[in-house]
Structures are given as C-alpha cells and as structure tokens.
Design a protein with these regions (language model features):
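N-terminal assembly/interaction segments in proteins that build large macromolecular machines
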Residues: 1-209
Length: 209
C-alpha cells in the first residue's frame, strides 16, 4: 500500500480541503491537498480531514510526519490520488473562534482576549474569508508596501489618456490622497463589514482591546 502511495506522491496536487477544530482557547488547523475537485468534495475526503484534525489535537504539531504516513497508509491508495498535508498548525489564544466556508477550502480563525463576544468573533472570521484582509490595522502596513502601491497607481495613471499627460508630481499628490483608502481596504478593522457594509469591522466589534 505505501509503495503504491509513494508513486502517487509524484503527481501534482491542485485541490484539497481544510478542517478546524476549536476547543476552549485552542484551534487545531489542518489542510490536505488532492488532485481533483471531485475527491475534495466527496464525503470520504471530508471524513479523512476530520480524522487528521483529531490526530493533530491528540498528538500535537510535532506529529505532522506521522499524520502524513497515516494518510498514505489508510487513504491514498483507496482514494487513488496524491494526498499531501499542506497545513498542520495549532493556534492558542484567550478566546478562539473559527469559520470554514461551505466549500471547505476557505477558513479563518480569530483569536482575542477574554471578554470578547465569541459569536461576533466567528462572524469576523466569516468576514475574513470573504474580504481577505492583509493586515489587522493600517498601523501594521509598512512604508515599503505603501511605496510599492504608489508606484502601481502611478503606472496606471500614466497609462490613462486622461491623466498620463500630467507631471509625476501632480499624479503623486493625487495618489497620496488615495493611500488612506488603500490602507483601509487591506486592513481588517477598517474594512466595511460584509454582513452590514454600512459599518466598519472595528465598529461591529466595539472597542478594540
């Protein structure tokens, strides 16, 4: 079985799924890749994800190699595809909430101090899977990232017939005025909350401890 599974391990993997188990202040996160969407959506693949997540919870992050062997010996041959662990992680916090999208391929975990509303944290995790923020707040965005975005915007404006004739100095002033919007769009707390676009995530959560 393992020899045949080893042959399958040479094949490329493009699909997969993930599973998150939460228990008190800890989240156990695993993702396993496979070759086809058909298998990724099957009940047997989803059942395997449950087993691997439980194995992580029982044995800790250091058991990743053992978990991969478990998959190869018990599932790869039966499923007929190359199955590879892509994520095998434990997250600890005071309050942990997780959301896994219905397709089993998108998920987010929110971790906060004691006192936060777990239901709200789960809704924010749902927001993260939809809005894909890159930072928690604008303060975390480096000047290097901002400068790179400015150059991207500058090139776009130069290629715009209505703006391209203006001097770079003028264009950069216009771009500087747009950086606040850019920072807000990529920062979780400043994003419009997907369940109520009229409020920002930070306002939905209340005080940001």
């Amino acid at each position: 079985g393992l020899a045949k599974a080893a042959k399958k391990a040479d094949r490329e993997v493009f699909e997969g799924g993930l599973r998150i188990i939460t228990d008190a202040d800890t989240a156990y996160i695993i993702s396993v890749s496979c070759e086809t969407d058909f298998l990724a959506n099957s009940d047997k693949f989803k059942a395997m994800l449950d087993v691997v997540a439980a194995f992580l919870k029982e044995n800790g992050e250091s058991s990743r190699d053992e978990a991969q062997k478990l998959i190869e010996s018990n599932y790869s041959l039966e499923m007929g595809e190359n199955l590879q662990i892509k994520q095998y992680e434990i997250m600890k916090g005071w309050v942990v909430a997780a959301y896994v999208h219905s397709n089993g391929k998108l998920a987010a975990v929110t971790v906060a101090q004691v006192g936060w509303d777990e239901v709200k944290l789960k809704q924010v995790a749902m927001h993260v899977t939809a809005a894909n923020p890159e930072y928690l707040s604008p303060d975390e965005i480096s000047e290097e990232v901002v400068e790179k975005e400015k150059q991207i915007q500058l090139e776009m404006m130069k290629n715009d017939p209505a703006m391209g004739t203006k001097p770079d100095e003028v264009l950069l002033k216009i771009i500087d005025g747009k950086m606040g919007k850019f920072k807000g769009e990529v920062s979780l707390l400043e994003q419009a909350f997907v369940m109520d676009p009229n409020v920002k995530v930070k306002d939905f959560l209340g005080s940001t401890k």
